[in-house]
């Protein structure tokens, strides 16, 4: 079960040209259905993730962006999605990275065991469905750990190759984040200060 994230500038630029219009764009949901997934129509599905060009790039209003992503994640949490699929790179980036920020600010984590909800672009989802190696797709660079999702989907992967480049050289590993552990394991809680 997964929520498609399609309420963004991609759906709004040419609202009459898209299948389903800007309010109910169907292309992403159709891809999910065709690949055997089950879409979730959660209450804030059509709400902006906060990346909007004006909101983040021009005005750099981080508070607005975090608040919008928080609202969307809270809205989809009761549905317990396996992962989120986005057609916009901004949505994918924000819904992935803001989970860490929300965990630090609010002490709230999402997903199975509080480990976060993986967020994939539709290209990454297509690559996995077509049998590409997840590390070749760059999935190790996500903020939220993708291994539990890969296991649930039955996708073979080599944990030892996660941070190796094409020629077997180590490409670097991101530092652990609060999203990949339980709230009780966090070093500090901002609200408690």
Predicted ranges, named:
Residues 1-193:
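Iron-sulfur cluster-binding electron-transfer modules in prokaryotic oxidoreductases
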């Amino acid at each position: 079960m997964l929520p498609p994230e399609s309420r963004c500038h991609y759906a709004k630029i040419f609202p009459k040209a898209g299948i389903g219009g800007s309010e109910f764009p169907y292309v992403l949901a159709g891809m999910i259905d065709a690949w055997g997934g089950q879409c979730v129509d959660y209450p804030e599905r059509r709400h902006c993730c906060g990346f909007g060009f004006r909101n983040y790039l021009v005005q750099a209003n981080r508070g607005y962006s975090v608040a919008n992503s928080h609202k969307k994640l809270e809205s989809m949490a009761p549905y317990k999605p396996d992962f989120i699929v986005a057609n916009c790179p901004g949505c994918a980036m924000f819904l992935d990275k803001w989970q860490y920020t929300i965990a630090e600010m609010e002490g709230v984590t999402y997903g199975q065991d509080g480990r976060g909800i993986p967020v994939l672009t539709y290209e990454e989802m297509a690559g996995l469905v077509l049998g590409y190696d997840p590390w070749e797709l760059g999935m190790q660079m996500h903020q939220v750990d993708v291994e539990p999702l890969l296991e649930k989907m039955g996708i073979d992967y080599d944990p030892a190759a996660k941070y190796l480049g094409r020629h077997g050289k180590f490409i670097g590993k991101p530092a652990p984040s609060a999203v990949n552990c339980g709230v009780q394991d966090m070093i500090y809680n901002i609200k408690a200060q």
